[in-house]
Structures are given as C-alpha cells and as structure tokens.
Amino acid sequence: MAALSCLLDSVRRDIKKVDRELRQLRCIDEISSRCLCDLYMHPYCCCDLHPYPYCLCYSKRSRSCGLCDLYYPCCLCDYKLYCLRPSLRSLERLRRTTNRILASSCCSSNILGSVNVCGFEPDQVKVRVKDGKVCVSAERENRYDCLGSKKYSYMNICKEFSLPPCVDEKDVTYSYGLGSCVKIESPCYPCTSPCNPCNPCSPCSPCGPCGPCGPCGPCGPCGPCDPCNPCYPCGSRFSCRKMIL
C-alpha cells in the first residue's frame, strides 16, 4: 500500500505538469500558423515591441511565416508546434493510462462510473440524470483571430450509462476530481436487491446461582453371607466325589 501511495503521488505530480504543458501546446495550436506581431499581440513572443510572453521572434523562423519577414528576422510560430506534436500525443496517451490507473485503484465502493473530460473546464461539464440514465456532456468554444477575421471551433463529448436498479436518481451525485475525471457516485453501493438492516442482538440472560449440594445418603447394610455348600467346604482344596458302586 505504501508503494502504491507513492506511485499515485508521483502520477498526480506528472498529471499537473502535463496539464500545464497541454495548455501551452493548445494555445499554440489554436493560433494561426503566421506570426501577427505587427497586427495583433502574438501569444508567444519575445521581441522588443511585444515583450515576453508575447513573441518568439528571436528564435528560428519557419518558411511559412510571411509577415515576420517584413519586420522580424526569425520566428517560432510553426517550428515549435510541429516539433512538439509527438510529445503532445505521448502526453495524451499518458493521461489516458493514468486516468485508468486512478479509476481502478480507487477504494470507494459507491462510485458508479467515471468519465474523462480532459480539455474542459469544470463549468463546461454538465451531468444530467433522467429515466434511470446518467448523461455526462461537455462543450467548449474556441475563438481566435486570424488576419483580421475571427474563427471559431467547437469541441464536445457526450457519455451515457444506465443506473443500477437499486439506486435512486435523487441520490446520485458527481464530482470533478484529479486527472479531469467526473466521478458519478451514490450513497449506497449498487446491488441486485436492497440491503436488509441487521437485527439487534438480544441481551445475554443473567447466569443462575449454583444450587447447594445435597447431603450424602446413608450407606446400605451389607447383605448376609451365603452358607457354604456341603459339597464344597470352605477352605477345601478338593471337592468330595460320590462313589458309585
């Protein structure tokens, strides 16, 4: 158990680090491939006009960045993005694996299910319980400027599963936990039949007092000895024989 706790702590720290890196990479991915330092404030820039963290124009420039040729000698608009895309995919795989480990190692017996909502904020997640089913949905709108025009992109997920027969819809609760997982819980562990309450134990009866010992009865008189057989006198070693003539 101690080794498992240490492993989970290290995994949680890795998840926080991964979250920070994913947020940075998504910001890069949502921006246009061209550096718009002259028109707009680029989200990742270090030039004199827009100090850090609003540009990376002093780094190497990608050939597809056209506007940076007019004002700045180099840029990292595309270079950093394409170099880090393999890392982004590996981090996503690590997140999914970690979420499965955390879900399987949870010791709470009242968890009905968990849904991974990575990439969504808690206020963007909705949970609806109706007709014996739980529906977890999340939707996010991405908006960014590109060459004077605004572009929009949408991202949504929807997961649904049925409740066990013994769980009431009013008792279902949910929480947004570690690893961007929404946990659906109920106050009673789901079972096929409702649990019967335990009968109270009956109190122990008091022990009865020990009865007094009865007096010993008088010894009976010894019976009289039987008379000796005349054929076998007492103390004789040989029996008398009757001679027949």
From Swiss-Prot:
Region (2 X 5 AA repeats of [RC]-C-L-C-D): 34-78
Top-level taxon of the source organism: Eukaryota
Keywords: Cell projection, Cilium, Cytoplasm, Cytoskeleton, Developmental protein, Differentiation, Flagellum, Phosphoprotein, Repeat, Spermatogenesis
Annotated InterPro entries: A-crystallin/Hsp20_dom (IPR002068), HSP20-like_chaperone (IPR008978), ODF1_ACD (IPR037552), ODFP (IPR037389)
Tissue expression remark: Testis. Specifically located to the round spermatid layer and to the luminally-oriented cytoplasm of elongated spermatids.
Keyword Cytoplasm assigned: yes
CDD domains with a match to the protein in the record: ACD_HspB10
GO molecular function: protein domain specific binding
Modified residues (Phosphoserine): S5, S10, S64, S87, S108, S109, S137, S153, S175, S180
UniProt key word Metal-binding: no
Region (C-X-P repeat region) residue spans: 195-233
GO biological process, any: cell differentiation
Chief localization: other
Subcellular location, record wording: Cell projection, Cilium, Flagellum; Cytoplasm, Cytoskeleton; Cytoplasm, Cytoskeleton, Microtubule organizing center, Centrosome
Record's comment describing the protein's domains: The C-terminal contains many C-X-P repeats.
Subunit structure: Interacts (via leucine zipper motif) with TCP11. Interacts with SPAG4. Interacts with KLC3. Interacts with CCDC42.
The protein's role, per its UniProt record: Component of the outer dense fibers (ODF) of spermatozoa. ODF are filamentous structures located on the outside of the axoneme in the midpiece and principal piece of the mammalian sperm tail and may help to maintain the passive elastic structures and elastic recoil of the sperm tail.
PANTHER family reported for this sequence: OUTER DENSE FIBER PROTEIN 1
Protein name from the UniProt record: Outer dense fiber protein 1
Taxonomic source organism: Rattus norvegicus (Rat)
Gene: Odf1
